């Protein structure tokens, strides 16, 4: 690997960074424990498919069902409901994390292109961020995003995207689930793709083999590679 891995506390949150010199791209990704296990494979995959120097920042999320969702919703698994912490997470990225990264690596907004990506609920967070004013991102990756989330598609239909590039993906067996709300995910992701294209967003939709609980890292890596190749 050409990247150096390091751990840091940035703006009060623990982050895992993969760094190389002369970076032209910042890749930001909220992660859980499983995502962190796949980081090495993910970074290696991106390295193998682009020569563009980049820095990847994995933001450790401790309350997965709260910090990534924009409004409350009933629980799907177990008894923990979804919260509305996405606003605070975006504020942290925009006002603290990016400022510390620019200072640490002697960068300015004009030096690098910033992409946001994530898997599952982090993919939903990326989609939601794509619709927020003053978004600091040039493109987003929503890999197997939770587009089934209560109220999401109505929100996407009634708001204007603020990014110019978006990558979506889904496993071809993800709709085969006993969880009713998630069984519509194939239809939901295609509706999301159509909504973005109606707004003239450069949108890529990719189908992967398998269900939801596999290949998180590679699936997310594919999205970042597409952005690097199409949005710089």
Please name every model-derived segment.
Residues 113-118, 143:
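Short beta-strand immediately N-terminal to the catalytic nucleophile in serine-hydrolase-like folds
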Residues 148-219, 225-227:
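The feature captures the conserved acid-bearing segment of alpha/beta-hydrolase catalytic domains
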């Amino acid at each position: 690997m050409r990247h150096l891995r390091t751990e840091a506390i940035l703006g009060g949150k623990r982050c895992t960074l993969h760094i190389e010199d002369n970076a032209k791209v910042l890749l930001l990704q909220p992660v859980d424990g499983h995502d962190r296990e796949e980081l090495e494979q993910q970074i290696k995959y991106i390295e193998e498919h682009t020569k563009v120097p980049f820095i990847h920042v994995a933001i450790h999320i401790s309350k997965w069902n709260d910090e990534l969702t924009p409004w409350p919703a009933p629980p799907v698994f177990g008894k923990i409901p979804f919260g509305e912490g996405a606003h605070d997470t975006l504020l942290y990225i925009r006002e603290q994390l990016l400022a510390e990264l620019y200072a640490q690596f002697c960068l300015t907004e004009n030096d690098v292109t910033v992409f946001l990506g994530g898997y599952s609920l982090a993919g939903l967070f990326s989609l939601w961020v794509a619709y927020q004013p003053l978004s600091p991102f040039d493109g987003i990756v929503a890999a197997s995003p939770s587009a089934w989330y209560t109220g999401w598609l109505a929100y996407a239909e009634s708001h204007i995207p603020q990014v110019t590039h978006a990558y979506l993906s889904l496993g071809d067996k993800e709709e085969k689930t006993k969880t009713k709300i998630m069984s519509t995910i194939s239809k939901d992701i295609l509706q999301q793709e159509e909504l973005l294209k109606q707004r003239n967003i450069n949108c890529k939709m990719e189908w992967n083999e398998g269900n939801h609980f596999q290949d998180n890292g590679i699936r997310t890596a594919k999205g970042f590679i597409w952005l690097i190749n199409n949005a710089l």
